[in-house]
């Protein structure tokens, strides 16, 4: 049985190792630019994606899109494959709110990476009255929000969401997944999300006593 287990592991890992050798030869010897979708960055967790952030930092794992509300609860979580640009995800995130809760939000605050004139126009067309992008990328405050006051409120709200993400990483282990496989990766993320929401609801209940 032990020999069969080892044989099974070799059958799984040898093709991955050969793919790593191939992509290394293409990149180093032939000078070819290997597309990220073709790269194997871990033979033990072959589902791992290469994630570039702000064209500076490189991470390995999967991009996670979180949506939070005024209740401090996490309202939605998307665990993505590949490294799609944030600007390509804006409409989907809004549509998911409509699918889950039956309506679009009246106000929204997003990272600068989600900003574009097309995304702003699309959001306004869905009835979202105020859309605050952390970095306007050519958009004026008057285009995004009905007033500078609302814009500042939404910016502060987004800062609170960022603080919540830091808490997820620091206290609930969301900075690094220790479970094996992509399905387990998703379970790990959702366990942190559910735990965070349960803690938030418990704090609210305790504050009422």
Question: Where in this protein do the model-derived segments appear?
Answer:
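Polybasic low-complexity intrinsically disordered regions
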Residues: 1-106, 110-112, 120-122
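An internal, acidic/charged active-site-proximal segment
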Residues: 2-5, 100-109, 113-155
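Basic, amphipathic alpha-helical segments enriched in Lys/Arg and hydrophobic/aromatic residues
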Residues: 24, 149-209
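Short acidic (Asp/Glu) and glycine-rich catalytic loops that position anionic groups and cofactors
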Residues: 42, 68-75, 102-103, 138-147, ...
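Generic structural "secondary-structure junction" signal
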Residues: 42-45, 76, 81, 116, ...
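Hydrophobic alpha-helix feature that most strongly marks membrane-spanning transmembrane helices
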Residues: 71, 79, 95-102, 113-114, ...
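Short C-terminal domain-edge/linker segments immediately following a structured domain
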Residues: 96-98, 107-109, 138-142, 162, ...
């Amino acid at each position: 049985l032990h020999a069969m287990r080892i044989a099974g592991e070799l059958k799984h890992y040898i093709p991955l190792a050969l793919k790593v050798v191939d992509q290394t030869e293409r990149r180093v010897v032939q000078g070819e630019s290997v597309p990220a979708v073709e790269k194997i960055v871990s033979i033990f967790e072959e589902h791992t994606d290469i994630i570039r952030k702000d064209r500076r930092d490189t991470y390995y794992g999967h991009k996670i899109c979180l949506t939070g509300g005024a209740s401090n609860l996490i309202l939605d979580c998307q665990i993505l494959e590949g490294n799609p640009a944030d600007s390509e995800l804006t409409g989907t995130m809004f549509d998911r709110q409509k699918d889950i809760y039956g309506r679009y939000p009246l106000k929204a605050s997003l990272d600068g990476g989600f900003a574009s004139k097309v995304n702003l126009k699309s959001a306004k067309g869905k009835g979202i009255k105020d859309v605050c992008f952390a970095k306007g990328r050519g958009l004026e405050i008057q285009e995004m929000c009905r007033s500078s006051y609302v814009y500042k409120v939404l910016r502060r709200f987004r800062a609170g969401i960022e603080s919540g993400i830091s808490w997820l990483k620091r206290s609930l282990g969301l900075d690094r997944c220790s479970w094996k496989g992509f399905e387990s990766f998703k379970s790990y993320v959702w366990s942190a999300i559910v735990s965070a929401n349960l803690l938030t609801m418990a704090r609210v209940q305790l504050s009422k006593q």
